[in-house]
């Protein structure tokens, strides 16, 4: 932590949603929520106050069309946030939710077991990898 920084940042890594807030010490505005840019559906980007704690494992043919619309570079092959939740509602066997809960499970921390009911052709990932995606 830098004591000379004009900002303080708070991060809530929730089981259902994550959020970021900040305060500028030299301004009277108080704390503010930082909007998080994310894909909210196919070809649709938006900035929202929370990032749903969902990870979607796209089909190979979906991957470039989904991740190619992001305004930032990513080496990640998974989609997180609202778009992950929306696409996962359509294809639930490719959706990971509540990964934070698996962090305390003996097998779930580092073993690649998620998504639990994934098709055989889908590479599974660990709860730690989901939490850092």
Predicted regions and their residues:
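Phosphate-binding loop and its immediate beta->loop->alpha context
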Residues: 32-133
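Gly/Thr-rich phosphate-binding beta-strand-loop-beta motif of the actin/hexokinase/Hsp70
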Residues: 2-30
